[in-house]
């Protein structure tokens, strides 16, 4: 009976990867805590407010105006990360940041570069805060005894609601496993387009099903791998390939797709043997280079 010997260098490399992953998770958690520092401040006491603030009051009008404004927004498209009326914005923001942290870890496991992931994440968090925490209007320095009437409240609420409706949705970018450049984003508008995209991807993969592609190995060399070694159904490969940034757009335009990048993506997610053989950092660079080369054509 043959025995399987494990190379000690492979074990050490695996342990090093685990330690790096733990350090990365700790760094992400610290960054999230830093971004939440403004939520941990001391509450404002009413007695400590300026005298001008104490003179502010709301006119006791019926809430029918607010109800009308809420009904105006019914039937319109609601942004993915836009909060519902009556929900605690701080709790929703905390939940949103938790999801962002989980998504960052997933993207790093898939080989994405941390700096690229973090720059995109910062933009998404800023957009979320801009939509759901609009800055209050500044008071005039000349009129210190301003009274907030029901008419002013209606104007402010309407402007805030219109601002939310006009903001572009970036939560879809967070929901992707590994988001690509915004210019590469595309989604099928109907079932017919989606089927044509899948057919184009399947056609190109089937033509190169047995072709071997070079990948960097952990032993500082290379190894050959092809779609046949995945032992997967073609439909499953196509479904996974559609998650590669830019592939659906290229297939929709009838252009060539980066097959080596697609193979590396699918194998990294579904083949344990491939995960043990490949050097993740070098693979990430190769896949990114392939994407850039094909999408720039």
Curated annotation (Swiss-Prot):
| Region Disordered: start-end pairs | 132-177
Nuclear export signal, short sequence motif: residues: 49-58
Motif range for Nuclear localization signal? 211-214
The UniProt record lists the keyword Phosphoprotein: yes
Q: Which residues carry this modification: Phosphoserine?
A: 63-64, 162, 210, 271
What residue stretch is flagged as signal peptide? none
Give residue spans, biased composition: Basic and acidic residues. 139-157
Enumerate the CDD domains for this protein: RABV_P-protein-C_like
GO cellular component terms, A-Z: host cell; host cell cytoplasm; host cell nucleus; virion component
Q: Where is the composition biased (Polar residues)?
A: 158-169
Disulfide links within the chain? none
Keywords, ordered alphabetically: Chaperone, Cytoplasmic inwards viral transport, Host cytoplasm, Host nucleus, Host-virus interaction, Inhibition of host innate immune response by virus, Inhibition of host interferon signaling pathway by virus, Inhibition of host STAT1 by virus, Inhibition of host STAT2 by virus, Inhibition of host TBK1 by virus, Inhibition of host TLR pathway by virus, Interferon antiviral system evasion, Microtubular inwards viral transport, Phosphoprotein, Viral immunoevasion, Viral RNA replication, Virion, Virus entry into host cell
Q: Does the keyword Transit peptide apply?
A: no
GO molecular function terms listed in the Swiss-Prot or TrEMBL record: molecular condensate scaffold activity; RNA-directed RNA polymerase activity
Q: Where is this region: DYNLL1 and DYNLL2 binding?
A: 138-172
In terms of Pfam families, this protein maps to: PP_M1
User: How is the protein altered post-translationally, as described in the entry?
Assistant: Phosphorylated by host PKC and by an unknown kinase.
Q: Which GO terms describe its biological process?
A: microtubule-dependent intracellular transport of viral material towards nucleus; symbiont entry into host cell; symbiont-mediated suppression of host cytoplasmic pattern recognition receptor signaling pathway via inhibition of TBK1 activity; symbiont-mediated suppression of host JAK-STAT cascade via inhibition of STAT1 activity; symbiont-mediated suppression of host JAK-STAT cascade via inhibition of STAT2 activity; symbiont-mediated suppression of host toll-like receptor signaling pathway; symbiont-mediated suppression of host type I interferon-mediated signaling pathway; viral transcription
Tell me which InterPro entries the record gives: PP_M1-like, PP_M1_C, RABV_P-like_C
**Biological function:** Non catalytic polymerase cofactor and regulatory protein that plays a role in viral transcription and replication. Stabilizes the RNA polymerase L to the N-RNA template and binds the soluble protein N, preventing it from encapsidating non-genomic RNA. Also inhibits host IFN-alpha and IFN-beta signaling by binding and retaining phosphorylated STAT1 in the cytoplasm or by inhibiting the DNA binding of STAT1 in the nucleus. Might be involved, through interaction with host dynein, in intracellular microtubule-dependent virus transport of incoming virus from the synapse toward the cell body.
**Homology family:** Belongs to the lyssavirus protein P family.
Specify the protein name.
Phosphoprotein
UniProt source species: Rabies virus (strain CVS-11) (RABV)
Q: Which gene encodes it?
A: P
């Amino acid at each position: 009976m043959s025995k399987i010997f494990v190379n000690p260098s492979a074990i050490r490399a695996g342990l090093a990867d685990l330690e790096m992953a733990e350090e990365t998770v700790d760094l992400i958690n610290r960054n999230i805590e830093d971004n939440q520092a403004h939520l941990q401040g001391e509450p404002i006491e009413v007695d400590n407010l300026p005298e001008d603030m104490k003179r502010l009051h709301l006119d006791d009008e019926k809430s029918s105006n607010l109800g009308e404004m809420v009904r105006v927004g019914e039937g319109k498209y609601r942004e993915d990360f836009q909060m519902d009326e009556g929900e605690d914005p701080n709790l929703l923001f905390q939940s949103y940041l938790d999801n962002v942290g989980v998504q960052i870890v997933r993207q790093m496991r898939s080989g994405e570069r941390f700096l690229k992931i973090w720059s995109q994440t910062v933009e998404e968090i800023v957009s979320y805060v801009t939509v759901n925490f609009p800055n209050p209007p500044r008071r005039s320095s000349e009129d210190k005894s301003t009274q907030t009437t029901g008419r002013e409240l209606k104007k402010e609420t309407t402007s805030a609601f219109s601002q939310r409706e006009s903001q572009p949705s970036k939560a879809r970018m967070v929901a992707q496993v590994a988001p690509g450049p915004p210019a590469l984003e595309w989604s099928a508008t109907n079932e017919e387009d989606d089927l044509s995209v899948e057919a184009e991807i399947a056609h190109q993969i089937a033509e190169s099903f047995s072709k071997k592609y070079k990948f960097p190995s952990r032993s500082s060399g290379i190894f050959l791998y092809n779609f046949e070694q995945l032992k997967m159904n073609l439909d499953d490969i196509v479904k996974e390939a559609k998650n590669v940034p830019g592939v659906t757009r290229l297939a929709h335009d009838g252009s060539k797709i980066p097959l080596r990048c697609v193979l590396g993506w699918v194998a990294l997610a579904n083949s344990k043997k491939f995960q043990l053989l490949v050097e993740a950092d070098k693979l990430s660079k190769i896949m990114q280079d392939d994407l850039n080369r094909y999408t720039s054509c």
